[in-house]
A protein has these predicted regions:
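SAM-dependent methyltransferase
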Residues: 191-283
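C-terminal lobe and adjacent flexible extensions of AdoMet/dcAdoMet transferase-like proteins
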Residues: 274-318
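A short glycine-rich, Lys/Arg-flanked "PGG" loop and its adjoining helix->strand segment in the class I
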Residues: 170-189
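Conserved class I S-adenosyl-L-methionine
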Residues: 2-65, 75, 79, 83
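A short acidic, Gly/Pro-enriched loop at the edge of an enzyme's catalytic core
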Residues: 142-152
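Class I SAM-dependent methyltransferase SAM/SAH-binding core
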Residues: 75-139
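Class I SAM-dependent methyltransferase "Motif I" SAM/SAH-binding loop
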Residues: 70-74
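A short SAM/SAH-binding and catalytic strip from SAM-dependent methyltransferases
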Residues: 150-168
Length: 318
């Protein structure tokens, strides 16, 4: 099957998310930039997206199915499970947990491996997590079990900006329309896709569009040094990020050094990159409507604008 994947074709082996070192450093970097208080608020937000579906324990059409698109190191899934577990002490009937199936999908095997490692010891036998390495633009075609079978899809951290190939975002939205379960409100809650766009001055993906002049490099984030937990004898040193704007695409690149802590010896130094599409609200809302998705709500959180989407009446548009 032909895959459409802007990051893999633009960056190849230097694409940051293919590196197991970056996979570990990513979590430290996010915590530093976003802050642990804001990350905890995100967990509440993710759980609140799920809660309307929870009282519906008598399901006729299989489990309550959640897709975490571009799951990365599984931050969204960990947030949901932590909240589920704390509520489960009191309020949630056990059969609801058994019926919950969460899919973590990402095109990077390195990120999925880390997500699995972080989640394995937290999982209860009642939780089903399905991991898949698939590109966003093909995720239903590659996993046909998801067709008309997803109650909630979450695409966090503005990662939709990574769909930079021509037509890639539209192709992803068409997959979302195939995935969302056709429901019968008010008996069953309407299936939803929650997709976030980063606010322009967010630090996470150096997405400061106004500050960029075509062809001119801009520097973001100071150098960051952190010890590895996975490889305790090593430490990371990330350089500041260089950002170059070219035809509506921001290309971010940086060096990641791996240093032996005891001796200070430099073991490796790689240049990594990714790219992001500069967001245009008009274009985005036109694509949503062309693909058959309606906006139920827009929600502002700390650094993201969330679009809560449902199927427009005529699903046949795709
Ligand atoms: C900024 S991280 C977000 C990770 C996680 N969702 C979070 O909130 O922390 C971006 C993720 O998007 C993934 N990604 C980028 N483009 C993708 C694509 N076309 N298909 C699937 N995953 C993609 C990357 O591999 C990476 O794990």
């Amino acid at each position: 099957m032909m895959e459409m994947d802007g990051q893999q074709s633009a960056h190849g082996e230097s694409y940051a998310y293919t590196s197991p070192y970056w996979a570990e450093f990513y979590d430290m970097w996010v915590e530093e930039i976003i802050g642990s208080a804001a990350l905890t608020k995100d967990d509440d937000f993710f759980f609140n997206l799920l809660s309307p579906f929870l009282p519906n324990s008598t399901r006729v059409r299989g489990p309550l199915r959640v897709v975490d698109m571009a799951t990365g190191t599984g931050r969204v899934i960990r947030g949901i499970l932590q909240k589920m577990n704390s509520r489960a002490q009191g309020e949630l009937p056990g059969d609801i947990q058994k019926e919950l199936e969460i899919w973590g999908i990402d095109h990077s095997q390195a990120m999925i491996n880390r997500a699995k490692g972080l989640l394995e010891d937290k999982m209860k036998p009642s939780t089903t997590i399905v991991w898949r390495t698939s590109a966003a633009a093909n995720f239903v075609d590659e996993n046909p079990e998801l067709r008309n079978a997803v109650d909630l899809l979450i695409f966090a951290a503005g990662s939709i900006g990574h769909l930079t190939a021509h037509g890639e975002r539209r192709k992803f939205l068409q997959q979302v329309v195939k995935a969302l379960r056709i429901t019968n409100p008010p008996q069953t809650p309407r299936s939803i896709a929650a997709i976030s766009i980063l606010k322009p001055d967010d630090g996470l993906q150096e997405n400061c569009s106004e500050q960029h002049v075509a062809g001119k490099e801009v520097r973001f984030n100071a150098e960051m040094r952190k010890p590895s937990r996975q490889w305790p004898h090593l430490e990371y040193c990330k350089s500041e990020t260089m950002t170059l704007k070219d035809k509506g695409i921001l290309v971010n690149s940086f060096d990641l050094k791996i240093v032996e802590t005891a001796t200070g010896k430099l073991l490796s130094q790689e240049k990594y990159s990714w790219s992001l599409q500069v967001f245009s609200q008009t274009e985005w809302e036109r694509e949503l409507s062309d693909c058959g998705l309606s906006i139920s709500q827009k929600v502002e959180t700390g650094s993201e604008t969330w679009y809560i989407l449902h199927l427009a009446n005529k699903k046949s548009l795709v």
